Amino acid sequence: MQQIHRLERKLLRATAEAIRDFDLVSQGDRIMVAVSGGKDSYTLLHLLMRLRERAPIDFDLVAVNLDQGQPGFPAQVVEDHLRSVGVPYRMLQRDTYSVVRRLVPEGKTTCPVCSRLRRGVLYNAAVEMGCTKIALGHHRDDLVETLLLSALYSGALKSMPPKLRSRDGRNVVVRPLCYAAEEDVAAFAEAMRFPIVPCDLCGSQPNLRRKRVKRLLAELSAEHPAVKGNLLHALAHVVPSHLLDRDLHRQLADATGRDPWLDAEDEEAEDCGEPPAGDGVVSLGGARGGR
């Protein structure tokens, strides 16, 4: 029980900090919490329910689970949990599984297509239900893995934003767990004995690139525990004068009337390998530093 309280306090602090830093929850919000049956979404729902009890603003939560037609998906397990915690919920059924199987060649990972179809269903449901925001369970590790995936395999410096507006402008997606470490989420979910639904029911091939990046981060973290926290910290401490983006350079030059590159300090000889000082929490304001 002591471990549960310790982990809950830590995760509540990280979640509340992210909500404050990025204005993720507002007065009167009706927030759809996408609950897949995995550790991340169960934990997100629990934390938002706890924060709602003590928040100085009023907001509503509705949990939504989507059964996409994967063989053996235990929708009743998820529904029983949602009923037991006393949150309003909706169980949706859309056979996107057969669509994915038709579109994706045998042996290829189905995750990207499946994700887009799932997102479309949730977006439409949020509008129909009058939800102002959709909360997803992506955590710190998801953000830093995506940062490396984008840089290494796509040649772009980007990750998952803490909030975004959908392309059609109808939905706002928020990620309140963006400061939370995956190992804390996993430990909390295990301690709480959430009824976890496996994510491989569809039989899809694993995302090998993401798994490779995850292994790389694990190896680096074994040598330098602050690696993941530092990468998250880097996402909020961009130094434009030390990058090669000419469009960004032009925007800054137009805004300031100065050439950012000529104003850059010579930092090439500096040792950038030291972890942040303190107890492992670095304000972005807010993002978590080394663990």
From Swiss-Prot:
The gene is ttcA. InterPro entries: Rossmann-like_a/b/a_fold, TilS/TtcA_N, tRNA_Cyd_32_2_STrfase, tRNA_thiolation_TtcA_Ctu1. Its EC number is 2.8.1.-. The lineage of its organism: Bacteria, Pseudomonadati, Myxococcota, Myxococcia, Myxococcales. GO terms for biological process: tRNA modification. Pathway: tRNA modification. One of its GO terms (cellular component) is cytoplasm. This is tRNA-cytidine(32) 2-sulfurtransferase. NCBIfam families: PRK10696.1.
